[in-house]
Amino acid sequence: MNTYYLIVNIIEDTTRETYRLFISAASYQEAVDKVFEQYFDEDSQSIENITVTEFYETDMLVSKSTADRIIADLNEYPVVEKEKL
């Protein structure tokens, strides 16, 4: 399993929501699929764009357990921006 960092812009009515997520997955495609399943409602939302990069815990210069805890905290509140269009 790899960890991927995704920035997802979702449009709903006149609002853009930006999600910043860390997803554990075997591939980029699996990470995107998980986002579709967990955060996206096809009936009322459209995806503007998705940026996916592979994330390495060593990029954070902390231990794996600390990185896992930080990632869990960040994923608990994934919507970081809402913008009226």
Model-found features: residue ranges?
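Short aromatic-glycine-(Arg/Gly/Cys) micro-motifs in beta-strand/loop hairpins
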Residues: 1-18
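Extended low-polarity, hydrophobic cluster-rich segments
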Residues: 7-8, 22-24, 52-55
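A short, exposed loop/beta-hairpin motif centered on an aromatic-Gly-Thr core
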Residues: 16-28
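A short, charged, amphipathic alpha-helix used as a generic interaction element across diverse proteins
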Residues: 26-48
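Short, mixed-charge low-complexity intrinsically disordered segments
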Residues: 40-85
